UniProtKB/Swiss-Prot annotation:
Compartments (UniProt record): Virion; Host nucleus
Lineage, broadest ranks: Viruses, Monodnaviria, Shotokuvirae, Cressdnaviricota, Repensiviricetes
Family (UniProt): Belongs to the geminiviridae capsid protein family.
Predominant localisation class: virion
Xref: InterPro entries: Gemcoat_MSV, GV_A/BR1_coat, Viral_coat
Subunit structure: Homomultimer. Interacts with the movement protein. Binds to single-stranded and double-stranded viral DNA.
Alphabetical GO biological process terms: symbiont entry into host cell; viral penetration into host nucleus
Protein name: Capsid protein
Amino acid sequence: MSTVTWGKKRKRSGGDSKAKSRGSSSYIPRSVSSRRESLQVATFSWTSSGSGIKFSPGGAAYLVSNFPQGANDNCRHTNKTVLYKFMAKNTIYLDSSHYMKVFRAPFHFWLVYDKSPGANVPSTGDIFEGPSLFPHNPWTWTVSRAACHRFVVKKTWSCVVESNGIDPTKGQGATYYGPGPCNQVKSCNKFFKRLGVSTEWKNSATGDVGDIKEGALYIVGAPSQKSDVYVNGYFRVYFKSVGNQ
């Protein structure tokens, strides 16, 4: 019976071991990752008292990129800001004059970028083609051809409020068999990222639209169905100060 003989282990030469040691000890330098600077935060409410603001047919626009000059977190530190994120936590409710009606009223929002803002916040008629002809149908509005090089709609969303003919502030008797509750009050929350709205500022201390050299952001709201609607709550923006001081 023949025996199986296994091959002998090959002895490594000194050159092989040195080459392996050189390969194992090779160092690949890595770049040092710098920590990204935190975004600044500014929070706004619709009114200083916390009450709701009334929107009537035709709608209205309000400045979002409102950053006065200063050292606080909600202020601009340089002559340029970039707005990245937007959060809205709002409550929408009908004016009490519409409680006796039976209808549904969609409410529309837009985030609109203005490349060349003026001394005042523009009206919806300055931005859109439609408010004069269709003031009660804001879903038909679009940026006018004459202003398309100035205004850009970044985001849009809507929320529906309703009325069932019953005043919700009054109690009903034991024999009431009318309609049930409806969305006379509706919450409407939104969060948008990657907006990238760049704003260049004049050498001034305040943060109004007249202080902006280029690039403003507005929130625009408009009710439908000949209704008057209140919007209550707040919105928050996340931005960064860039450029020179």
